[in-house]
């Protein structure tokens, strides 16, 4: 068992015995003796129960499995979370997909320990349904409902004695799982369910049990979520699991006081996984997400890729797509890494598969909207003229530095001259890859998995040839840029010379969607005209723009290729500079910026215009002329590139968005990069140390995210506490070993963890996906073993 990264090392406790206070009914070779270790009783009881009843318990990555639809239960399954995957050496993705059948309530109980403490509640979608004999059972589902956990006989609540594991599971859940919502326990009688048990207590634990008529359920209050109590409960579960829970039950319809029911004592075994828990003030971050972004808090990003690979997938392409046979495995061995204890719903890095790549192609590269309604060819020269009048100073232009180009050709030698003499080289062919880290959502209410992104790029020697040319053109562009226009290149620029203050100013921001794939022939030709006027050598300029008119994108690893026209290539030499020029071209035309005073900030597709009066423009030109979907952001805010532009001591300073930092606090990090991660954090938050900024930022956060200033201030204070020392920063990380990728190793871990008991463990694995075969994760047996 791995220790944590901070001073308090975790020492696994020695396994203890579990004693059974139950009175077994009928003849049973395992009649309870309080002096005998209960593990053996558990095994024997489970063997007897399942031998006679022939019941299976299914742990599955599917919420539904037809083989297990028996009796009154419509569903038997467990939707796994990442915390089950943190089981040392055990991970369903290591099997390549599929399900695990077990027939031991002890295995069932240990799996339950591994899943539920990793969540603040079961409301995140966890389903745990256990069916026992006699039509009774225990159910944990997405609504925090326990069904048929008790038998009600002769006016008394009685634990099921036929299955010790079931009683233990019920006791563990009731005592140690925090209750963010009302929990109901349905009591099944021989006739029909007649009542419910509502459990609630202000601090999130259960102190009393009473019967409530089903019609009165609406009157039962919902308990609040107390994060500090959640942390305490989880810590007790994993470090000091030794409960004795007394339920004082009273019957509202019989008037009799039911006898107290004592749950068995249970001591944890070393196989119970150590889940990283927020400590101290880190719990305030969880509280912030629970209160203001519950969807982020409850989201389980670790299952996103699994869901993509297991679900059906349909996509239409308006262009021809070439698919080739390739072996692929979306689960790959990862290095040792540190896991954050803060639940922010941050997406896991994507692994390139055919499904992910096809989804990225369909969303990012093909199917561009066709909204242009005006002739385009006649506008090229006029748009270029307006661009120069609006953003660049007049005079001082020449045709380029001939000495620079001569030196460039001389240094590049034979490679460059071979290109010059081989104009028909296939430079229209691009390589393509999937971007592993996508843009995550900052919407507090509706976090969704971001659309996957592709990166298209040339081979290294092509970039080596064209990069110096574009650097020279950019240098000429910046040397003639107007003083009231800022284009950040490298670190964020000093805005004080442009904007002394935002007070009393009107801010205009345009959100441009589908930016890369919507760029068509008009913007392509206007860029070419601008580059030529900036001194780009004509032969090289014509060549560059020629192989951007129609390109062939190829992913050699996944065997996917297709063609695109005109749109921006996201990884070529001029991506950032070209996107910035496109934004400036459109803004100058739509708002006629050459005829009014303004200050402007442009960076890629991000933009911010500052004027004395509200800006009026022909917004319809975005779709009708430029084929671009655009949304005017009102009211505008001094926010740009995920940074607030704050006025401090008469200077405009870019300050990173604390909420984005909080969101990224849920990221995991490889151990070898942890120190670099901390240094990057210090550099990114250096502007937050100023008192003026820390006073201003909570007000800006409250306006943007609709939270109170106190809540924003607490979040900001927590970020600043991480700057105090590296130890303080590392406290919300925990070490986790890499998942084993060997089936034999996994089998060994199963047997060592669960003991040498007569458990039937069957593992299925789906066929490797390709464009000719369908995944069948439930019917293809890969390995079967019995110990």
Swiss-Prot record:
* Start and end residues of each RdRp catalytic domain: 505-619
Q: Write the record's keywords in alphabetical order, separated by commas.
A: Nucleotide-binding, Nucleotidyltransferase, RNA-directed RNA polymerase, Transferase, Viral RNA replication
Protein role? RNA-dependent RNA polymerase which replicates the viral genome composed of 3 RNA segments, RNA1, RNA2 and RNA3.
Catalysis performed (reactions)? RNA(n) + a ribonucleoside 5'-triphosphate = RNA(n+1) + diphosphate
Q: Does the keyword Nucleotidyltransferase apply?
A: yes
A Pfam family hit: RdRP_2
| EC id | 2.7.7.48
> What's a GO biological-process term for it?
viral RNA genome replication
The protein's name: RNA-directed RNA polymerase 2a
Q: Which InterPro entries match?
A: DNA/RNA_pol_sf, RNA-dep_RNA_pol_alsuvir, RNA-dir_pol_PSvirus
What family is this? Belongs to the ssRNA positive-strand viruses RNA-directed RNA polymerase family.
Annotated GO MF terms: nucleotide binding; RNA binding; RNA-directed RNA polymerase activity
Annotated source species: Olive latent virus 2 (isolate Italy) (OLV-2)
Subunit structure of this chain's protein: Interacts with replication protein 1a.
């Amino acid at each position: 068992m791995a220790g944590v990264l901070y001073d308090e090392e975790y020492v696994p406790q020695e396994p203890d015995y579990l004693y059974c206070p139950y009175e077994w009914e009928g003849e049973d070779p395992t009649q309870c003796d309080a002096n005998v270790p209960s593990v053996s009783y558990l095994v024997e009881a489970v063997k007897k129960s399942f031998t006679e009843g022939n019941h299976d318990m299914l742990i599955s990555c599917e919420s539904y499995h037809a083989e297990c639809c028996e009796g009154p239960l419509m569903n038997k399954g467990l939707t796994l979370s990442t915390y089950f995957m943190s089981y040392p050496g055990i991970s369903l993705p290591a099997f390549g997909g599929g399900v695990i059948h077990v027939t031991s309530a002890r295995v069932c109980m240990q799996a339950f320990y591994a899943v539920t403490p990793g969540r603040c509640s079961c409301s995140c979608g966890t389903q745990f349904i256990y069916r026992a004999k006699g039509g009774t059972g225990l159910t944990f589902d997405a609504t925090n409902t326990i069904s048929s956990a008790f038998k009600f006989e002769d006016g008394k609540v009685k634990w099921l004695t036929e299955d010790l594991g079931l009683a233990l599971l019920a006791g563990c859940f009731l005592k140690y799982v925090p209750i963010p919502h009302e929990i109901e326990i349905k009591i099944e009688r021989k006739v029909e369910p007649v009542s419910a048990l509502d459990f609630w207590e202000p601090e999130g634990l259960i102190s009393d049990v009473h019967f409530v008529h089903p019609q009165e359920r609406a009157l039962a209050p919902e308990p609040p979520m107390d994060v500090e109590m959640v942390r305490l409960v989880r810590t007790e579960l994993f470090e000091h699991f030794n409960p004795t829970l007394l339920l004082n039950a009273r019957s509202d319809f019989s008037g009799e006081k039911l006898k107290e029911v004592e749950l068995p004592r249970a001591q944890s075994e070393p196989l119970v996984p150590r889940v990283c828990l927020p400590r101290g003030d880190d719990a305030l971050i969880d509280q912030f997400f629970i209160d203001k972004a519950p969807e982020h808090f409850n989201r389980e990003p670790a299952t996103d890729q699994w869901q993509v690979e297991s679900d059906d997938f349909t996509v239409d392409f308006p262009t021809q797509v070439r698919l080739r046979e390739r072996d692929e495995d979306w689960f790959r061995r990862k290095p040792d890494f540190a896991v954050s204890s803060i639940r922010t719903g941050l997406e896991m890095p994507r692994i390139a598969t055919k499904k992910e790549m096809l989804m990225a192609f369909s969303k990012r590269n093909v199917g561009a909207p066709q909204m242009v309604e005006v002739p385009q060819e006649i506008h090229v020269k006029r748009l270029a003229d307006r661009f120069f009048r609006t953003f660049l100073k007049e005079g001082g232009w020449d045709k380029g530095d001939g000495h620079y180009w001569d030196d460039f050709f001389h240094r590049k030698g034979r490679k460059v001259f071979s290109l010059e003499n081989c104009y028909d080289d296939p430079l229209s062919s691009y390589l393509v890859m999937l971007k592993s880290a996508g843009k995550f959502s900052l919407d507090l209410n509706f976090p969704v998995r971001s659309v996957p992104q592709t990166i298209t790029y040339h081979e290294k020697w092509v970039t080596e040839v064209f990069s110096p040319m574009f650097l020279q053109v950019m240098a000429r562009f910046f040397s003639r840029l107007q003083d009231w226009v800022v284009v950040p290149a490298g670190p964020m620029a000093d805005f004080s010379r442009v904007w002394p203050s935002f007070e009393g100013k009107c801010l205009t921001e345009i959100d441009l969607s589908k930016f890369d794939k919507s760029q068509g022939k008009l913007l392509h030709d206007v860029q070419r005209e601008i580059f030529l006027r900036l001194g780009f050598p004509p032969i090289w300029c014509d060549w560059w723009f020629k192989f951007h008119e129609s390109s062939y994108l190829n992913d050699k690893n996944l065997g996917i290729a297709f063609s695109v026209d005109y749109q921006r290539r996201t990884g070529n030499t001029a991506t950032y500079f070209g996107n910035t020029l496109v934004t400036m071209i459109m803004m100058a035309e739509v708002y006629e910026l050459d005829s009014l005073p303004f200050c402007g900030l442009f960076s890629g597709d991000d933009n911010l215009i500052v004027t004395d009066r509200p800006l009026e423009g022909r917004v319809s030109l975005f779709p009708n002329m430029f084929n671009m979907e655009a949304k005017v952001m009102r009211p505008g805010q001094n926010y740009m590139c995920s940074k607030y532009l704050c006025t401090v001591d008469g200077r405009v300073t870019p300050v990173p968005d604390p909420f984005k930092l909080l969101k990224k606090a849920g990221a995991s990090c490889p151990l070898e990069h942890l120190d670099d991660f901390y240094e990057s954090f210090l550099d990114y938050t250096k502007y937050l140390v100023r008192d003026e900024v820390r006073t201003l930022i909570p007000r800006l956060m409250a306006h943007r995210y609709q939270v109170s200033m106190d809540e924003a201030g607490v979040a900001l204070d927590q970020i600043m506490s991480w700057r105090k020392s590296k130890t303080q920063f590392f406290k919300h990380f925990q070490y986790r070993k890499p998942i084993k990728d060997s089936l034999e190793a996994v089998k060994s871990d199963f047997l060592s963890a669960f003991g040498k008991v007569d458990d039937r463990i069957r593992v299925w694995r789906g066929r490797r996906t390709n464009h000719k075969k369908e995944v069948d994760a439930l019917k293809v047996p890969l390995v079967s073993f019995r110990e």
